[in-house]
Swiss-Prot record:
Region (Membrane-binding amphipathic helix): 1-27
Chain coiled-coil ranges: 209-239
Pfam families registered for this protein in UniProt: BAR, SH3_9
Family: Belongs to the endophilin family.
Entry protein name: Endophilin-B2
SUPFAM superfamilies assigned to the protein according to its UniProt record, in alphabetical order: BAR/IMD domain-like, SH3-domain
Residues covered by the BAR domain: 24-291
Primary gene name: Sh3glb2
Species this chain originates from: Rattus norvegicus
Length: 404
């Protein structure tokens, strides 16, 4: 019990000494040991890394989960060390509503069939989003969170300890300075020639004793200063090594950032592929749903393409006049070899990107090759008939640059 009380009293005295030193430094009444410029740069870089890591972490969480209530719920589950329940994505919820609407409105109607197709696509988009969130959380958010909750807490603890060691060092310096000043004053008083007519001899004896006491106090203060300096140097070296480890944290964050970009690229590529498949499905059935739809105008002339996009040029493509011998759009899609190009109204087009045919009715394309294109009545405006040699098939307009 006595030992605990002595330790408590000692800790209270140290805390009071540090508080006095800190207060005097703030008011400019005490000297402060300054760290070297390199150490200050390390501290500034560490603080900047911590601040920006927190911002990037929070904003990435917003990107992956825009709902703030859901983020708070996930945070509470993590703090309670409980598994976060599986959550339905917005795409999956939309797919569910569309499927239910198709079942109620009639799955065999054109609208119901389209709802079912879009529902399947939205379901795949929701699954891709779920995979992206899971991958990004593991490969990007978790390392950033581990840095803030692990490495940074260790750095902060050692920095606080270094601050305490510095306050102890400066307090020892101030104590030594005061002891030397008192010793010098006592020495001056002891060297004065006594005047026995006015002063009692015992006062000079007391002055000599005080000088000896201050000598002991100076020796004690110097010893405490050396010990405090040793502790400060040791703690400064430990803190310096931790701060220099921020470079390793940057390398780790860079690797995690590459993983995040990779997962995001995969996610958007999956979304693009799913939507492209959906667009093809809807385009193949559009002729049957809207049999009276025609593309463009019968005028062969068209303005220059330098200021128009590939999508808008489809509106200026010539259309094969409707004749008695021309098969319906559905039949033309199946018997493209029997479709003859119009005598006039064909155009040349340059392929912008490689395109792989999805089925036998489409024409595979290679970038930068030239093909002949034209349109048929009732075709989807996003598609044209392309010819290359003795091969022909449907080609997407967005992959072409129509030439004058």
């Amino acid at each position: 019990m006595d030992f605990n009380m002595k330790k408590l009293a000692s800790d209270a005295g140290i805390f009071f000494t540090r508080a006095v030193q800190f207060t005097e430094e703030k008011f400019g009444q005490a000297e402060k040991t300054e760290l070297d410029a390199h150490f200050e740069n390390l501290l500034a870089r560490a603080d900047s890394t911590k601040n920006w890591t927190e911002r990037i972490l929070r904003q990435t969480e917003v990107l992956l989960q825009p709902n703030p209530s859901a983020r708070v719920e996930e945070f509470l589950y993590e703090k309670l060390d409980r598994k976060v329940p599986s959550r339905v994505t917005n795409g999956e919820l939309l797919a569910q509503y569309m499927a239910e609407a198709a079942s109620e409105l009639g799955p065999n109607t054109p609208y119901g069939k389209t709802l079912m197709k879009v529902s399947e696509a939205e379901k795949r988009l929701g699954a891709a989003e779920r995979d992206f969130i899971h991958t990004a959380s593991l490969s990007f958010l978790t390392p950033l969170r581990n840095f803030l909750e692990g490495d940074w807490k260790t750095i902060s603890k050692e920095r606080r300890l270094l601050q305490n060691r510095r306050l102890d060092l400066d307090a020892c310096k101030a104590r030594l300075k005061k002891a030397k000043a008192a010793e010098a004053k006592a020495t001056c008083e002891g060297d004065t020639v006594p005047d026995f007519q006015e002063t009692r001899p015992r006062n000079y004896i007391l002055s000599a004793s005080a000088s000896a006491l201050w000598n002991d106090e100076v020796d004690k203060a110097e010893q405490e200063l050396r010990a405090a300096q040793t502790e400060f140097d040791r703690q400064a070296e430990v803190t310096r090594l931790l701060l220099e480890g921020i470079s390793s944290a940057h390398v780790n964050h860079l690797r995690c950032l590459h993983e995040f970009v990779k997962s995001q690229t995969t996610y958007y590529a999956q979304c693009y592929r799913h939507m492209l498949d959906l667009q093809k499905q809807l385009g193949s059935s559009q002729g049957a749903i809207f049999p009276g739809t025609f593309v463009g105008t019968t005028e062969p002339a068209s303005p220059p393409l330098s200021s128009t996009s590939p999508t808008t040029t489809a509106a200026t493509m010539p259309v094969v006049p409707t004749g008695a011998g021309l098969a319906p759009p559905e039949e033309a899609a199946l018997c493209l070899e029997e479709v003859a190009p119009p005598a006039s109204g064909t155009r040349k087009a340059r392929v912008l990107y490689d395109y792989e045919a999805a089925d036998s009715s489409e024409l595979a394309l290679l970038a930068d090759e030239l093909i002949t294109v034209y349109s048929l009545p009732g075709m989807d405006p996003d598609w044209l008939i392309g010819e290359r040699g003795n091969k022909k098939g449907k080609v997407p307009v967005t992959y072409l640059e129509l030439l004058s």
